[in-house]
Structures are given as C-alpha cells and as structure tokens.
Curated annotation (Swiss-Prot):
Alphabetic keyword roster: ATP-binding, Cytoplasm, Kinase, Magnesium, Metal-binding, Nucleotide metabolism, Nucleotide-binding, Phosphoprotein, Transferase
Cofactors, names only: Mg(2+)
Active-site positions on this chain: 117 (pros-phosphohistidine intermediate)
Enzyme Commission number: 2.7.4.6
Presence of the UniProt keyword Nucleotide-binding in the record: yes
GO biological process terms, semicolon-separated: CTP biosynthetic process; GTP biosynthetic process; UTP biosynthetic process
Cited SMART domains: NDK (SM00562)
Binding site residues for ATP: 10, 58, 86, 92, 104, 114
Function as written in the Swiss-Prot or TrEMBL entry: Major role in the synthesis of nucleoside triphosphates other than ATP. The ATP gamma phosphate is transferred to the NDP beta phosphate via a ping-pong mechanism, using a phosphorylated active-site intermediate.
Protein name: Nucleoside diphosphate kinase
Catalysed reaction, written as an equation: a 2'-deoxyribonucleoside 5'-diphosphate + ATP = a 2'-deoxyribonucleoside 5'-triphosphate + ADP; a ribonucleoside 5'-diphosphate + ATP = a ribonucleoside 5'-triphosphate + ADP
Organism: Mycobacteroides abscessus (strain ATCC 19977 / DSM 44196 / CCUG 20993 / CIP 104536 / JCM 13569 / NCTC 13031 / TMC 1543 / L948) (Mycobacterium abscessus)
Family, similarity comment: Belongs to the NDK family.
C-alpha cells in the first residue's frame, strides 16, 4: 500500500551539509519525493508541530532548536513509507538506540539534535503534511 509521510531534515542536518546524504538514503530506499522545500520555521508552526510535547520540560529548548535555522521539509511516498523512513532514520537516541547504518546512528550525536524527523503514524503524517504543505 502506498502511503505518505512527512520528513524534516532539521537545522543541524542543514548546518552540517547532510541534506544530500539524507535524500540519497531516502531515494536508495525506494521512496519518492512528492514535495520538498527549504523553510525557516516560525514559532507558530514549531508549536503546532510539537504540540504533543507542550507540557514536557524540554519543549522550550525544542522550539529554540527547530527555529534556529533553515530546515528541509519533504513529503515522501511509497509502500509503507512511514515505517520505511523510520527504519532508515534509526532510533531517536542516536547513541543508545540508533543502529549503525541508519541516518542517526551514522551522523547524530544527541537526542534533540538528531538530524531528522519522520511521522510516526498515518494520523500524524496526515496532520503534519497538512501543517507543512497545506496545498497538498
């Protein structure tokens, strides 16, 4: 079944020049880019995207990080796109949970600045795509 997912290459990935590497891995996995845009994120979009974390102690630093510079937002399509991207992304904690060979396992150094975000369910993918790409 073909599905869509939202992927963000976060500001640390853009700053470190890893956009091409991430896109290469996405394409090698067989996923298709349906939309791609370099964006500077405003506070309202950041708050809406991370609303589920609003009451957590790290929310402020998360907002500060995600708005600290440009990021790349993309919509990917393909069979089981959500699970496929999450597999190549690796675990959220790049040191303890991300396998070598995954994006985070190979390039990320800490949990918050872990290079990429990928939707975790069809429901969150629909919500996130509508937020980042309202015309789709």
């Amino acid at each position: 079944m073909t599905e869509r997912t939202l992927v963000l290459i976060k500001p640390d990935g853009v700053r470190r020049g890893l956009v091409g590497e991430v896109l290469n891995r996405i394409e090698r996995k067989g996923l298709t880019l349906a939309a791609l845009e370099l964006k500077n994120v405003d506070d309202a979009t950041a708050r809406a995207h991370y609303a589920e974390h609003a009451e957590k102690p790290f929310f402020g630093s998360l907002l500060e990080f995600i708005t600290s510079g440009p990021l790349v937002a993309a919509v990917l399509e393909g069979p089981r796109a959500i699970a496929a991207f999450r597999q190549i992304a690796g675990g959220t904690d790049p040191v303890e949970k991300a396998a070598t060979g995954s994006i985070r396992g190979d390039f990320a150094l800490e949990t918050q600045e872990n290079l990429v975000h990928g939707s975790d369910s069809p429901e969150s993918a629909a919500r996130e795509i509508a937020l980042w790409f309202p015309a789709l």
